[in-house]
């Protein structure tokens, strides 16, 4: 992209970045005229981060600690954070994924007070044996609900087939047995390792300014220098072979769910370009504009939920195709045949351009929404990129790039 166009794009995106003395990355997109503000406080700590070394001490966590910690952050000696948010009128939530935990809220009033709730609860954790025991029962019920979800069981089943050792095999919430092992010491160790400001991102978009967000950081000690020691994640060797060729689960469903997974070589950290390229390739193969999707859908073999996705975390990269069908074996064979055809012939240039424009448009459209803006900023910042850099990178991807990548992924031996 020409330099003048890049400068114009950065002005249009209008993200303001600061790295505080504590190491915290702060990104703000002021959106004058908007009535609400969306704020996300995110850490690079997810369900796969179970084995690590910090200050010479090795820590090995049972499955589900990151998700458990997310729940416990909302409770301290002063009561429940949701009750405090209710007083400010903010709508708050949180979630844990494989590689991150995010705390968020949307506010139309009393933004300073809501920021104090968010920053206060995340920077001042409080755990006891009694509060942990109470939460173990609550999350245990949540785990049982996930066990009854065919869609979630399908995804975890795919991971169990693809991976021998990688912790992505384990459910994000853990099991009833694994969370029973959680102690206050484990939670405090996790906070020290992963909730250090240098491992976190604070993003805000809407009716706010960088000055307002920095003032909140000042109130909660996030402007002070902190130790720069980084946690060292520990991984078991993962072979490129499959753990299992297939798996079948019997559950009460109206239509069978199916999944086809490909185990790929792990990508380098923060390689968003290759991830975006893989995503475009999947759109060309199974997206709504692809010939395969039309044949499957028009033939009644799949419903609109059929499609593919890329999952990339540390030590793991896989491509998953999922959907519902009364003839899953036929769909799988048609999928494999289409992949072989496109690998030999190359991606359709017109479809590639349409898919690329669609992705590009989604990134631009997100700039007009406070929730999507903050989420987009936090998501890319956790991988070391700005939104403008991501847009520029996407614009530079070509069909020739896709053809070259296809020679190294989606191999039948890895399915």
Write out the residue ranges for each language-model feature:
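Second-shell loop/turn segments in exported
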Residues: 55, 70-72, 102-106, 126, ...
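Extended amphipathic alpha-helical segments enriched in small hydrophobics
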Residues: 319-348
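Flexible, glycine/charged-enriched surface loops at secondary-structure junctions
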Residues: 229-235, 303-309, 345-355
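Acidic/histidine-enriched segments that form metal/cofactor-coordinating
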Residues: 77-190, 303, 334-337, 347-375
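His/Glu-rich zincin catalytic helix
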Residues: 1-81, 188-295, 413-414
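C-terminal regions of mature proteins
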Residues: 7, 201-206, 342, 353-413
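A structural supersecondary motif
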Residues: 259-266, 283-325
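Short, conserved charged micro-motifs
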Residues: 111-114, 209-214, 269-271, 328-333
């Amino acid at each position: 992209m020409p330099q003048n166009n890049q400068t114009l794009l950065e002005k249009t995106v209008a993200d303001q970045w600061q790295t505080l003395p504590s190491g915290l990355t702060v990104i703000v997109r002021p959106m004058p005229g908007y009535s609400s503000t969306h704020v996300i406080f995110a850490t690079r700590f997810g369900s796969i981060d179970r084995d690590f070394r910090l200050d010479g001490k090795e820590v090995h966590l049972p499955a589900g600690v990151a998700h458990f910690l997310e729940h416990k952050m909302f409770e301290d000696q002063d009561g429940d954070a949701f009750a405090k948010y209710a007083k400010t009128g903010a709508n708050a939530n949180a979630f844990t994924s494989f590689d991150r935990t995010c705390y968020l809220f949307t506010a139309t009033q009393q933004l300073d007070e809501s920021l104090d709730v968010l920053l206060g609860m995340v920077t001042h954790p409080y755990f006891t044996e009694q509060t942990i025991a109470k939460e173990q029962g609550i999350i245990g019920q949540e785990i049982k609900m996930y066990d009854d979800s065919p869609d979630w069981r399908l995804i975890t089943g795919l991971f169990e087939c693809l991976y021998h050792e990688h912790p992505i095999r384990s459910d994000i919430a853990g099991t009833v047995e694994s969370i029973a092992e959680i102690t206050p010491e484990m939670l405090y160790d996790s906070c020290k390792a992963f909730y250090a400001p240098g491992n976190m991102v604070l993003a805000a978009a809407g009716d706010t300014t960088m000055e307002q967000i920095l003032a909140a950081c000042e109130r909660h000690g996030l402007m002070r220098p902190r130790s720069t020691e980084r946690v060292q994640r520990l991984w078991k060797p993962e072979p490129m072979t499959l753990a299992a060729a297939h798996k079948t689960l019997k559950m009460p469903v109206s239509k069978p769910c199916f999944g086809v997974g490909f185990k790929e070589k792990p990508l380098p950290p923060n390689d968003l370009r290759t991830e975006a390229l893989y995503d475009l390739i999947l759109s060309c193969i199974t997206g709504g504009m692809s010939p395969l999707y039309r044949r499957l859908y028009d033939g009644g073999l799949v419903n609109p939920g059929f499609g593919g996705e890329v999952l990339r975390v540390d030590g793991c990269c896989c491509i998953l195709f999922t959907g519902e069908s009364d003839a899953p074996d036929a769909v799988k064979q048609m999928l494999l045949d289409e992949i072989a055809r496109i690998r030999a012939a190359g991606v359709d240039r017109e479809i590639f351009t349409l898919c690329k424009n669609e992705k590009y448009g989604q990134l631009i459209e997100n700039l007009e929404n406070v929730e999507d803006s903050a989420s987009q900023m936090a998501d890319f910042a956790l991988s070391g990129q700005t939104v403008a850099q991501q847009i520029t990178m996407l614009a530079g991807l070509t069909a020739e790039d896709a053809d070259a990548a296809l020679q190294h992924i989606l191999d039948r031996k890895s399915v």
